[in-house]
A protein has these predicted regions:
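Active-site acidic/histidine proton-transfer and metal-coordination neighborhood
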Residues: 1-88, 157
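Short, flexible loop segments at the rims of nucleotide/cofactor-binding pockets, characterized by
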Residues: 64-65, 93-95
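Histidine-acidic metal/acid-base catalytic patches
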Residues: 45, 49, 53, 71-90, ...
Length: 202
C-alpha cells in the first residue's frame, strides 16, 4: 500500500494442480464442492472488507489448474461475492486455456474487472496439453503462452474495443510466461510493446 498499490490479486490455491509438473492438467483439474465454493466466497468477502478499509480492492484471478477456471465457476463465484468488495482479475490466456471465450468473459464482467493480464496462446502447444497427458507446467515450458500479438488464439481487436468503450482505468499487465532460454525476454518485450502501442496508441 505504501508504494501505491491499490489492487490485491488473489487466487484459489487450496486444491490446485497447476504447480505439479507430472500431473496432466485437464484430466485432473479440480472441481470445488458447493461448500468449498461458499467458503472461498466468504473468505474473499472478508478479505475485501479489510482491503476496502485500506483503500484497496481485492480482484480474484481465475487460473487454469485451480478450482476456479471455467465461466460457470467464475459465474458462481461472482454471484456469491459482493461486487463492492471483490472484483475480477481478467486474464486472456487463462480464460482461453480453460476453453472459454475471453471476449465473452470480458463483455460480461467488464464492470467488475479491476486488473488485467494480457497474453496470447500458441494453439499447437495448447492442443498437445488439451489432448495429451501433459501438465500445465509442461505447457508453459514448451511455449503454450506468449505475448499479445504473437499467438493465434485471442481476438485482440474485440478485447481492446471492449476496453476502449468501457470506463476501465486500471492496469493492463503484459505477460509472456515462456522459457527465457527459448524466447529472448527483450525480444518478446519489444514485440509486446509494439503491439500494445498499435492497439492503444500509448
Amino acid at each position: 500500500y505504501g508504494l501505491g498499490a491499490r489492487v490485491i490479486g488473489v487466487g484459489e490455491c487450496g486444491v490446485t494442480v497447476h504447480g505439479q509438473e507430472e500431473t496432466p492438467l485437464f484430466p485432473n483439474s479440480p472441481i470445488l464442492t458447493e461448500e468449498q465454493m461458499k467458503n472461498l466466497a466468504e473468505g474473499l468477502n472478508e478479505l475485501g472488507r479489510r482491503a476496502k478499509r485500506k483503500g484497496m480492492k481485492v480482484c480474484f484471478h481465475p487460473h487454469v489448474g485451480t478450482g476456479i477456471q471455467s465461466l460457470e465457476e467464475i459465474d458462481r463465484l461472482m454471484e456469491l461475492t459482493d461486487p463492492e468488495l471483490v472484483g475480477l482479475l481478467f486474464d486472456t490466456g487463462h480464460s482461453t486455456i480453460a476453453g472459454e471465450n475471453p471476449v465473452e468473459i470480458l463483455t460480461k464482467y467488464i464492470d467488475r474487472v479491476g486488473h488485467i493480464h494480457v497474453k496470447d496462446v500458441r494453439r499447437e502447444v495448447f492442443e498437445q496439453v488439451k489432448n495429451g497427458d501433459h501438465s500445465f507446467l509442461w505447457g508453459v515450458k514448451n511455449g503454450m503462452f506468449t505475448v499479445p500479438g504473437d499467438g493465434n488464439c485471442v481476438d485482440w481487436d474485440q478485447i481492446f474495443n471492449i476496453l476502449k468503450s468501457s470506463n476501465y482505468e486500471g492496469w493492463i499487465v503484459v505477460e509472456a510466461e515462456q522459457d527465457p532460454a527459448k524466447a529472448d525476454p527483450l525480444e518478446y518485450a519489444q514485440k509486446a510493446r509494439a503491439f500494445m502501442r498499435t492497439q492503444l496508441g500509448v
